[in-house]
């Protein structure tokens, strides 16, 4: 049950980052995701071996990032016109509130690596992979989505919590589709983060 210790650590790190905020958010996020990357690497270092299908997986990752951005653009349109979540624009603004803490170019780089890399490498690359060997694809998928969503609940931001649930479902399903190959979800997360936060923000 060692994985539960790592999940508990992620809960603590996310609570510190999003709620306590003792230091600059981006420094805290970079440290947290780097730490989770090290944990994931120690447990599943064979994931980083280059395979002959690497280029294909990278292209799928880039394409899926574009698809996910389109889903969120459509979601923003629905929220604006149907109003499923009251005061959703306040929630979106809160997500982008940390944008002024560093220059945009630096935030974009950090979102690509280590943040996007570290998040995906831990949640899908380590946790979902580890659970799939014990419980199979479906249970590991559902448990990972639950934990990934739950670490965002202390923010009390319904937009962020819903977003975490959706991307957790998306990247978890992509991981299963690619037969537990982490490359496509990894690239997808690394590309999508700076795209939606810096390059083409939805606020």
What are these regions, as identified by a protein language model?
Residues 28-36, 111, 163-171:
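Hydrophobic core segments of transmembrane alpha-helices in multi-pass, intramembrane catalytic enzymes
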